[in-house]
């Protein structure tokens, strides 16, 4: 991360970065787990960065949060309960509430993410006050290993597979998660930019393929993430089928997006085939 002459830049490589002109920096804090920065930008409103990478902005957060929740929701036979690992901003929980999920457990490792989101992104973090949401501050990997509860959806709303999130992308975690899924349940994770982070997509896909027989990747356009092309990878013990019931659109998500998001560019298919 760089902040030079009122520009915040996320570096993708030594030769490439995406820069946002900022009005001011609202905070910078080093927690026990990560560095959190918050900026007020001209074009995207408030921007939350963790360890130098963009996590969300006011202007486009809805795309990521709709796609990580609504796609798996409409690919399950039923969705009465959900577990979110990460998601300390509350955006994923908010979408699941809107979808009518009756029980949502949200496990976030860093209390600071929740507190910052409550203050600066209340439209998202107010979801934690909903009666259907149980917020747990703790290690999601340990929670999945220790709990006896099963869920129809498990959503891995984490940072990239480094630091505290690294353990969310391996076979051991997926084995424990499989035991926590209902028979027709789905687990989904963000799996990075296929263009700039193919290893993240490979890591998520391989980890799931080692444990699940049904694994699918889908994509979305998120303008503030590397390249704008972002991948998500889901898995189930059962066949993954799109439901036939009435699909309620979001601001980005709709019935066409649900179908089209699974049509992958050839280079993305080749990344997956190379595993």
Curated annotation (Swiss-Prot):
Keywords: Cytoplasm, Polyamine biosynthesis, Spermidine biosynthesis, Transferase. One of its GO terms (cellular component) is cytoplasm. It is found in: Cytoplasm. It comes from the Archaea. The active site is at 157 (proton acceptor). It catalyses: S-adenosyl 3-(methylsulfanyl)propylamine + putrescine = S-methyl-5'-thioadenosine + spermidine + H(+). GO terms for molecular function: spermidine synthase activity. It is an enzyme of class 2 (transferase). Disulfide bonds: none annotated. S-methyl-5'-thioadenosine binds at residues 34, 108, 139-140, 164. The keyword Cytoplasm applies. Its EC number is 2.5.1.16. The keyword Transferase applies. Spermidine binds at residues 65, 89, 157-160. Residues 5-237 form the PABS domain. SUPFAM superfamilies: S-adenosyl-L-methionine-dependent methyltransferases. Homodimer or homotetramer. Belongs to the spermidine/spermine synthase family. NCBIfam families: PRK00811.1, speE. This is Polyamine aminopropyltransferase. It comes from Picrophilus torridus (strain ATCC 700027 / DSM 9790 / JCM 10055 / NBRC 100828 / KAW 2/3). The lineage of its organism: Archaea, Methanobacteriati, Thermoplasmatota, Thermoplasmata, Thermoplasmatales.
């Amino acid at each position: 991360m760089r902040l030079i002459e009122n520009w915040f830049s996320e570096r993708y490589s030594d030769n490439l970065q995406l820069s946002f002109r900022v009005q001011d920096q609202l905070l910078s804090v080093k927690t026990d787990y990560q560095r959190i920065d918050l900026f007020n930008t001209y074009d995207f409103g408030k921007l939350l960065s963790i360890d130098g990478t963009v996590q969300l902005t006011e202007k486009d957060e809805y795309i990521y949060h709709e796609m990580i929740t609504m796609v798996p929701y409409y690919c399950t036979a039923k969705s009465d309960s959900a577990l979110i690992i990460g998601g300390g901003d509350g955006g994923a929980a908010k979408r699941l509430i809107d979808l009518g999920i009756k029980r949502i457990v949200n496990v976030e490792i860093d209390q600071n993410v929740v507190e910052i989101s409550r203050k600066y992104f209340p439209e998202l973090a107010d979801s934690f006050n909903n009666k259907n949401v149980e917020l747990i501050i703790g290690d999601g990997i340990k929670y999945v290993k220790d709990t006896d509860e099963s869920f129809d959806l498990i959503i891995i709303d984490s940072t990239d597979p480094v630091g505290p999130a690294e353990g969310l992308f391996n076979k051991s975690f997926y084995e424990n998660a499989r035991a926590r899924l209902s028979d027709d349940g789905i687990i989904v994770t963000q799996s990075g930019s296929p263009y700039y982070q193919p290893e993240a997509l490979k890591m998520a896909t391989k980890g799931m393929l080692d444990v699940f027989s049904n694994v699918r990747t889908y994509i979305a356009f998120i303008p503030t993430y590397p390249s704008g092309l972002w991948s998500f990878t889901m898995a189930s013990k059962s066949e993954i089928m799109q439901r036939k019931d009435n699909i309620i659109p979001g601001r980005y998500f709709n019935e066409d997006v649900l179908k089209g998001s699974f049509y992958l560019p050839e280079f993305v298919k080749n990344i997956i085939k190379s595993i």
